[in-house]
């Protein structure tokens, strides 16, 4: 009977572990497999707290029942109760919906199986030793219960142990990608910046298609492995456009070494990822590394971008290679005059906002220097489609929705509010605030609140604690407190849209936090 109970305990314990570690695996994946992602993730902390609270509650009951008769039977009853509690947790975890669900990639499967093996060893060894020592079943069940306190830590340890192998494995993919790049030998263009990378990449790809067969990295796959995946699709392409992402010092240098681009675009620099860069000076230094190319260098003419020889600047200043001296934005799009080289074009686009016009001009400058005619560039700009979630105008009945949920920086937020200002009717802003701004996060969100107060008629805030600086900024800016609505989740806010929105309203959805916030 004791051995049958122990066997059942091992099976049920391992199955329970396999299901209940999902939040920790998810937090790890969302943080780029940084072990700290398990513990820092704000949406997965409740899982750790719930498990710990459940274990402590049952341990207290277990200790109290030690003094009753037939405690072995009571132990089995308590174990059954605990099993039902875990079953409830499993169902709860399975039902939870996420914007980016946990993906069981090859790496995740390896980590998952490794963590299960470690837990099975801990549980099996402990139960085996206790059985061999004649420890009664009551305490064996208690030991199995206490092992649940190790769930998150086992995932963390598994990740640390697996890291050297994963680095070697990643290096293999990167090396294969580098070799394929050498073999295919396309024109390689690198694009980086604190904002606008994906937009400029997509706009440039559309312009270059008039002359070249183009492959660009997908979505925001801007890490070495993302590059490797994209390079795997190279098939007699003339041009490869690589979007470079950077969260810390050294990231751009690593990608430059991998891709060895011929040409580069620097879209702009602002205070972003300061939690991992630690200072704006580090951001500036790292982003400028993309301009270490022998070919065409294009950069936005902004305060944080240095004036360097051989760089073609894009902006609104005299002396810029590509200059915009008039921008008119409306609900139907943007009109602007573009001076490039010694030519002038009067252009119209369906894209909204000054920042999108600047992104078009950055792409146009590179395309022009790579042999795309001004007529083709004009045609591409006229027919350019908005990129999803980047100030995309969506009509929902009589309500205009400006979807800018992929915007997460102060400059982009200001541009989006300037676009909102151009719309007629009541103006509403929905936001959870901005993240990854380091020590400046509170002050920047406070300023965002003041800027919203100057434009909007109603504010919908997601998360009371996180948006407190925005709330304070709104009040400081003279905003009507009765027009501020706070919800803990975006889903709850959406369920109240029928009461919050009316015909003729324009709703700006500014930023959307990832699942680990």
Write out the residue ranges for each language-model feature.
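Walker A (P-loop) phosphate-binding motif
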Residues: 175-222
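Flexible active-site lid/hinge loop adjacent to a nucleotide/diphosphate
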Residues: 223, 234-307, 350, 422, ...
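Transmembrane-cytosolic junction motif
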Residues: 154-184
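ATP-dependent carboxylate-amine ligase
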Residues: 1-163, 365-375, 379-517
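Extended acidic/charged loop-beta regions that coordinate divalent cations
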Residues: 65, 116-133, 229, 238, ...
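Short catalytic-loop micro-motif centered on adjacent basic/acidic residues
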Residues: 190, 215-217, 239-243, 298-299, ...
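Acidic, Mg2+-coordinating active-site environments of NTP-dependent enzymes
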Residues: 266-400, 425, 450-458, 467-485
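Short, well-ordered alpha-helix to beta-strand connector turns
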Residues: 185-186, 211-212, 237, 261, ...
